[in-house]
Amino acid sequence: MTYKRVLLKLSGEALMGEKPYGIDPAIVQSIAEDVSKVVENNVQLAIVVGGGNIFRGLKGSADGMDRATADYVGMLATVMNAISLQDGLERVGVATRVQTAIEMQEIAEPYIRRRAMRHLEKGRVVVFGGGCGNPFFTTDTTAALRAAEINAEVVMKATKVDGVYDRDPNQFKEAKKYSSLSYQQVLSDEIAVMDSTAIALCKDNNIPIMVFDIFKKGNISRAVAGEPIGSLIS
C-alpha cells in the first residue's frame, strides 16, 4: 500500500549526519534525492523539521535560560533547517515551499492550512518551520498537529535507529525491536519515541506513526510504499 499524503518528521540530528553539530550537505543531498523519487510517484509530501542540530530548547532551559525564550530560539533553528532543506530539494528539481508558524515573510510563507494543502495538491513539497509557533511544544507534536490539519494518512518519523526498541539499542545489545505496537503501549510503557502529547494527538486522530532509519538510502521511498522497514505505531 502506497500512502498518498504523508507527513515526514525529520529530526535536526538527522541533518547533522556524523558532524558534531550543524548541517551536513551530503545528508541534505541524500534526503533530497530520496524525496524527489517519492514526489515522482505522485505522493503528496509535507515535512516538519526539528532544530536539535543547532539548538535544543530543553537543553537551553536546563542550562538556566528561560524555557519560553529557549524554545523560541529552537524555533528559529528549525527555520534555518527548513530553508536549507528547501535549497537541497530545489537543487534536485523538487518544487518546494517553506511555511513558518512565526511570520518571516522575506524568507518563507506564513503557515496557512489551505495554502499548504493547495501546494500539496499541485505536487509541491511543503516544509513546515518554526515549530507550532508556541513554546513548550516539541516539533514531534508539531508533526502530529500538522498531519491532522492537512489530513495526512501517516506520520513518518525519520531517525537514527531503524525502529522502536524496548530500550536504547546503542547501549543495550539485547534491546528488542517492535515491528508494531499500539499508541497505548507507547504511552503506558513510556517508550521514548515521541513525547506523549504527539502520541496522544495521533491516537485521537487515528494517524499511524512509522519510525524508520533515515540514513539508509531509499528508505523514505520504501516507507511511503508501505514496506515494513521500521516500526508501526497504530
UniProtKB/Swiss-Prot annotation:
Free-text function comment from the UniProt entry: Catalyzes the reversible phosphorylation of UMP to UDP.
Family indicated by similarity: Belongs to the UMP kinase family.
Alphabetized UniProt keyword annotations: ATP-binding, Cytoplasm, Kinase, Nucleotide-binding, Pyrimidine biosynthesis, Transferase
Protein's name according to its UniProt entry: Uridylate kinase
Class of enzymatic activity (EC top level): transferase
CDD domains: AAK_UMPK-PyrH-Ec
Single GO molecular function: UMP kinase activity
Record-linked InterPro entries: AceGlu_kinase-like_sf, Asp/Glu/Uridylate_kinase, Uridylate_kinase, Uridylate_kinase_bac
